[in-house]
């Protein structure tokens, strides 16, 4: 079972890429694209539920909404290395890791915007449901909660590829709960687009123009 944060950190270290954690805006000029005072010929925007905010400044409207997700982490005094992942019908998933760690979640809250507050009552309700599948949770120690924001489109489909009418900008969003599994594949394809390489998937199956459009009255 994959620890997403650890995987991301490992890949970043292996790539040697410089990571700058900063809130930025995108602007277009005759010399290219400006981000945080730097000029670029090509840009990949993989900003999840925030894609609409980035593209709004250059005249686009984006069919992407935020969905709040919460989960709870537990520690058990058991060997969970061979425990299976349990995915019953509904929102509940129970994901065991090594050395007794188990994660339970996650909520799918469509009306909470970008709120990141933990709702203990909601997680307690989910825990009660989880006990039917993992009675051991009753003896587990709660070690923390995590809250994040997923990106969804109106039809729950992801999209990726070139931004319409704006050469050199590539976008991806709408991955929802599949980001950890499908994100690396889509990221590879975006890198291939920038580098002029060959694709394994047909980008026409994930049409950007269906979800990202120029606002009425905006010039192409």
How would you label these PLM feature ranges?
Residues 19-34:
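A conserved short coil-to-beta-strand element within the FAD-binding core of flavoproteins
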Residues 36-39:
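Glycine-rich phosphate-binding loop signature in dinucleotide/nucleotide-binding domains
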Residues 14-18:
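A structural motif corresponding to the C-terminal end of an alpha-helix
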Residues 136-220:
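C-terminal catalytic lobe of FAD-dependent flavoproteins
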Residues 32-34, 101-102, 169-170:
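Hydrophobic residues embedded in beta-strands of well-ordered beta-sheets
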Residues 42, 47-164:
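Active-site substrate-recognition segment that forms the wall
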Residues 1-13, 117-122, 181:
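Short beta-strand to alpha-helix junction loop
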């Amino acid at each position: 079972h994959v620890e997403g944060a650890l995987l991301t950190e490992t890949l970043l270290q292996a790539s040697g890429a410089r990571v700058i954690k900063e809130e930025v805006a995108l602007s277009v000029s005759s010399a290219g694209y400006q981000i945080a005072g730097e000029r670029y010929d090509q840009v990949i925007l993989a900003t999840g539920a925030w894609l609409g905010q980035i593209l709004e400044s250059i005249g686009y409207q984006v069919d992407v909404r935020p969905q709040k997700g919460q989960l709870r982490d537990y520690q058990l005094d058991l060997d969970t290395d061979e425990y299976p992942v349990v995915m019953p019908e509904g929102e509940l998933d129970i994901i065991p890791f090594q050395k007794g760690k188990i994660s339970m979640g996650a909520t799918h809250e469509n009306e909470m915007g970008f709120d990141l507050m933990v709702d203990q009552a909601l997680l307690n309700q989910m825990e009660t449901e989880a006990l039917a599948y993992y009675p051991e949770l009753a003896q587990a120690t709660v070690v923390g909660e995590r809250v994040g924001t997923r990106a969804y489109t109106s039809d729950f489909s992801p999209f990726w590829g070139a931004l319409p009418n704006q050469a050199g900008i590539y976008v991806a969003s709408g991955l929802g709960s599949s980001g950890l599994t499908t994100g690396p594949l889509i990221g590879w394809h975006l890198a291939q687009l920038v580098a002029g390489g060959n694709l394994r998937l047909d980008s026409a199956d994930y049409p950007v123009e269906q979800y990202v459009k120029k606002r009425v009255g905006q010039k192409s």
